[in-house]
């Protein structure tokens, strides 16, 4: 009975309810791929920042971050194992936020405010990723092309 009610509600989804999750996933992909391009374009500078934050083996860390970004972005773009991709990006983002944007350690008000802004942005992105973990990818996703065309849980 609940399943019938859910399938009836699902068939009455508006256009925006149907397409919004896909565009939301695309926004995440854009954010992470542009971040990857920034890492590639400023490799030495970011490696130096990591060294200054006492992160061991910065080139290896950056390589792992790029792999996580690529895998997570592909996952979100196609909606394939979306929840796994979102968890991967969530873990990477929260670690990066706490490690690299530790605003609570800054004495200068301007620098503290700048780092807080980046930390808050990353924290909000983590919230969006957790929503995707809980709610799934939306209707336009490879995850939803299981046997019988129904949504895989």
Task: Outline where the language-model segments fall.
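Extended, low-polarity transmembrane helix blocks
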Residues: 1-41, 58-71, 77-153
